Amino acid sequence: MSRIILLITLFIFGCASQKPIKPNQVVNFDVPEQWEVNISQNLDFDQKWWNIFNDDNLNSFMVEFIDENISLEKAMLNTRKAKQASVIATGSLLPSISISSGVVESEQNTAGIPTVFSALLGQSSDEVTVFTQENYNLSLGTQWEIDLWGKLRQGRIATKQQYLSAKYFEDFLKLSLTAEASKLYFAIIEAEQVLNNASKKLKNAETIFELYSLRYNKGSISIQAYQQSKIIFNATKSDYNNKLLMVNSLKREARLLVKDYPSTEFLVNNNFPKKLPSIPNTLPADIVKRRPDLIAQQYNLLANKALDRQALLTLFPTFSLSGSYGSSSNDLEDLTNEDFSVWNRGLNVFMPVFNAGKLIANKRLAKSNREIAMLDFVNALLTAYKEIESGFESDLTSNKALEIINENIALSENIYN
């Protein structure tokens, strides 16, 4: 069952995106054009591919898994964060406009003013006068960094690629984790069947041990035979307990995946599906190029390339325009009077001269991140090919093993019948 889910997942991964990449541009060896698979049935898959198993318990579990799984929720939030970062970077290309207003009240006295100034004010040197003043202001200001070298545009490109990378990684994680969740579901079915067989073995071992105990008490068998039967019974009991522990562990893991208390209450069918799905006879290698995890790595590589270029452009001068228009008056009623209007405009130039090597280090860091992104992309590409090659080999091996088992069953029936 696990190999069926693996092959289905590989097929869905390839059909999840329609934006192919070109592996030959990043690897220097030939890749297969297609894989031949000896399976007769062709099926179309959608995002809810687990419905093809016709298992109501599985369907309920998968729906709850998609709604409640913590990893999927975190991936969705990371995609939202990346989208907002892209919005912020796009906004940096446009002028910023703001409105400011204020009122200031100040008080000043003539204490400590030289005598000559006191005389000018028409007061004696011993007299202290208090002045109170209010000022009202209202202004509209703007600032705009001129993206002369394209530094801000590279930042916008990088954040957009990061958003797309996060989006495709979310798609990949959804496909990958749903495949793992369905494998866990069928692993529980298998574990319960193994536990059921272990329970029957334990019951048989207990019956044999009771029979040997009865014969030993009557003196019909030796103590060695009695002890050997007890050893077999204890070993069978220990094996049953281990199988029970395995079932409970798998059920707790399933409950944990849906953000629920890890109890052992989990419903599954008693048997595997009678009709198993298949994949097409021939799979084109092009489906690997459309895997969402590879698309995510590709966008991550493009984002790091843009950040590398942006780090280089930070070494260039920065130009920005600023200006404001408003009014300032000691009387609130005069704020709308044109005689009290104030304005300013200017061009600011910032040229980095000395920063202890921070900009150079930032450029080298961006270059290293770009090289790491390239290695991650190549590794993801090779891993994708490895998974498909291993999956097909496992499928062929399992089919041969199934043929051998069926042959052994037929031989056993001929012997005992």
In which residue ranges do the predicted regions lie?
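Small/polar-residue-enriched beta-strand and adjacent coil segments characteristic
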Residues: 76, 83, 92-172, 282, ...
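Sec-dependent signal peptide recognition
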Residues: 1-8
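Bacterial Sec-pathway N-terminal export signals of envelope proteins
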Residues: 16-88, 272-302, 353, 381, ...
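Short, solvent-exposed, mixed-charge loop/turn linkers that connect secondary-structure elements
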Residues: 203, 222, 241-288
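Transmembrane beta-barrel architecture of outer-membrane proteins
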Residues: 58-60, 135-137, 183, 228, ...
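C-terminal motif of bacterial Sec signal peptides marking the signal peptidase cleavage site
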Residues: 12-14
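Amphipathic alpha-helical coiled-coil segments
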Residues: 74-89, 173, 177-200, 207-214, ...
